[in-house]
């Protein structure tokens, strides 16, 4: 067979690769551009991986010959992680010597010259050593502690905190059903609750006197003692609620009871509310002859009043004083007299009969209902304190309240007579810190009643030691919803707390229950109590009628306030 070779065929050419010759060692003489600026580190596949935190590195105990039996692989630190301190938060410390006051200079000068033993600078019982150091023996240490009142307190400084008393004594036959702590209650929310619908309106209102808006510190006005009856009737004793309960609603209460529950997370003092469940209906009541209707003073302060009951600055006496100031102020700022115009609602005052000839406070009662969802209809009695006629002739309903100053030095507050005219915001901010719960209750009551304005009066003692005479230093007005936003009061959370308690009681059997705020813990407890509780021992309650207690403090003539 003959082979023919095609000389015209094209074959791929072979190009010799460039082989670099390194005369001084091994490896390439030049690096490609892709590998420039890359640090070199000997690497072996047997090396343990770890960059940020290498707990697997072996330790070498031979300190003298550390490179002995060592391998170059896995020892490089080109890719090691180093934690760098952030110096942006670094601050220099001022090490300059503090200049001592003149009375402290050289007070150890004589000790450096003293000798051990009895001398001019050494007293009996003192051990004076060299270098100016003086120590007491154990006997004198105990004597010194006794004089200072130290004693054995095991690290406690100052007197122990005073434990608050409960509003009602828990009895052995009460069964605890539920405990609700404040952190859980604060997270509750029930949004989109519409404005309440009026069912009935009762009472007569007097018009507000605008001259009180011009009062200031330099033009103060004495607080008068108004002899008028103020009714604080509980839910089941209200004849209108009894009538409405037959046709409308399944949860019944008053605005004061609702405000106490809705603002419970801001309260520190103990309080209690009695709840009766009859079928599918719930009635919320306050106990008779209790301090439920008294206004607290400095309840949320860092240092609340803790004086004994004999002092005029005790918590109870301050609450009585604040309650009377509030009642007198709300009636004094109105235009009184037979010749003055009055605003009359559809029905008369339900708590007085037609044949009674008594002077009743200016109060308008508005019975409203709210739809809370899940077939829960709330019916409550709300109150207005006065009315104001606008230039257009339309009435504006007012909720009139009073803040009182008792002793700014003891209350850690600000001097109203110095700051009220120039820095009213600072005065109000201080009151929001000291009386957060009370102001929140007033705001909730104004929102529930549908008041157009919330009038706040500033009333102070003429003399800090005299709790029976007061002067009006100024007034201020707010819109309830705007003021609620200003004091960080969420109505959605308030409705959520109320709905939570209603749902909890609805799940129980028919009977009587009690909600109580723990006096020393941020907890609300629900108890199942016997049906005859508080029925037979009201007269033996031990506290007596609050009206009698008021007269002992103020000694008002012909005072018949029903509280």
UniProtKB/Swiss-Prot annotation:
Keyword list, A-Z: Cytoplasm, Initiation factor, Phosphoprotein, Protein biosynthesis, RNA-binding
Claim: RNA-binding is one of the keywords in the record: yes
Alphabetical list of InterPro entries matching this protein: eIF3d
UniProt subcellular location: Cytoplasm
Residue numbers spanned by region RNA gate: 291-305
GO molecular function, one term: translation initiation factor activity
Entry keyword annotation includes Ribosomal protein: no
Pfam families linked: eIF-3_zeta
GO cellular component, one term: eukaryotic translation initiation factor 3 complex
Single GO BP term: cap-dependent translational initiation
Record note on quaternary structure: Component of the eukaryotic translation initiation factor 3 (eIF-3) complex. The eIF-3 complex interacts with pix.
Swiss-Prot/TrEMBL domain comment: The RNA gate region regulates mRNA cap recognition to prevent promiscuous mRNA-binding before assembly of eif3d into the full eukaryotic translation initiation factor 3 (eIF-3) complex.
Entry protein name: Eukaryotic translation initiation factor 3 subunit D-1
Gene: eIF3d1
């Amino acid at each position: 067979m003959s082979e023919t070779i095609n000389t015209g065929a094209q074959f791929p050419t072979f190009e010799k690769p460039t082989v670099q010759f390194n005369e001084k060692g091994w490896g390439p003489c030049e690096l490609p551009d892709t590998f420039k600026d890359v640090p070199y580190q000997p690497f072996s596949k047997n090396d343990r991986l770890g960059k940020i935190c290498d707990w697997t590195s072996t330790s070498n105990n031979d300190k003298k010959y550390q490179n002995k039996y060592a391998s170059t692989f896995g020892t490089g630190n080109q890719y090691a992680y180093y934690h760098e301190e952030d110096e942006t938060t670094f601050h220099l410390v001022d090490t300059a010597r503090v200049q001592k006051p003149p009375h402290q200079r050289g007070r150890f000068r004589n000790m450096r010259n003293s000798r051990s033993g009895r001398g001019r600078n050494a007293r009996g019982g003192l051990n004076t050593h060299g270098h100016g150091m003086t120590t007491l023996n154990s006997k004198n240490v105990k004597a010194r502690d006794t004089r200072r009142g130290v004693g054995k307190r095991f690290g406690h400084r100052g007197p122990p905190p005073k434990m608050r008393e409960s509003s009602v004594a828990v009895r052995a036959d009460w069964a605890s059903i539920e405990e609700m702590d404040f952190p859980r209650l604060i997270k509750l929310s029930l949004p989109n609750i519409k404005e309440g619908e009026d069912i009935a309106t009762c009472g007569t209102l007097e018009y507000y006197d605008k001259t009180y808006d011009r009062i200031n510190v330099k033009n103060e006005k004495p607080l008068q003692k108004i002899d008028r009856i103020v009714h604080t009737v509980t839910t089941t004793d209200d004849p209108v609620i009894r009538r409405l309960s037959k046709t409308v609603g399944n949860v019944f209460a008053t605005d004061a009871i609702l405000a106490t529950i809705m603002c419970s997370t801001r309260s520190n003092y103990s309080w209690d509310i009695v709840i009766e469940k009859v079928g599918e209906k719930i009635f919320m009541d306050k106990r008779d002859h209790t301090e439920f209707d008294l206004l607290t003073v400095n309840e949320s302060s860092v240092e609340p009043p803790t004086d004994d009951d004999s002092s005029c600055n005790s918590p109870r006496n301050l609450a009585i004083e604040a309650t009377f100031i509030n009642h007198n102020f709300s009636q004094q700022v109105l235009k009184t007299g037979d010749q003055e115009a009055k605003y009359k609602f559809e029905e008369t005052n339900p708590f007085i009969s037609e044949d009674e000839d008594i002077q009743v406070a200016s109060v308008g009662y508005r019975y409203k209902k709210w739809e809370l969802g899940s077939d829960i209809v709330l019916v409550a009695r709300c109150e207005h304190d006065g009315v104001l006629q606008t230039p257009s002739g339309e009435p504006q309903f007012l909720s009139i309240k009073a803040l009182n100053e008792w002793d700014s030095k003891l209350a850690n507050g600000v001097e109203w007579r110095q700051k009220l005219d120039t820095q009213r915001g600072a005065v109000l901010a201080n009151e929001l810190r000291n009386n957060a719960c009370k102001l929140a209750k007033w705001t909730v009551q104004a929102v529930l009643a549908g008041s157009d304005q919330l009038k706040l009066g500033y009333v102070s003692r003429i003399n800090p030691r005299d709790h029976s005479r007061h002067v009006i230093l100024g007034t201020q007005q707010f819109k309830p919803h705007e003021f609620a936003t200003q004091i960080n009061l969420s109505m959605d959370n308030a409705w959520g707390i109320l709905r939570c308690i209603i749902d909890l009681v609805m799940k129980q059997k028919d009977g009587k229950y009690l909600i109580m705020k723990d006096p020393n813990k941020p907890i609300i407890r629900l108890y199942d109590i016997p049906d005859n509780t508080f029925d037979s021992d009201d007269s033996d309650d031990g506290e007596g009628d609050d009206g009698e207690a008021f007269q002992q403090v103020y000694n008002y003539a012909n005072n018949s306030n029903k509280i």
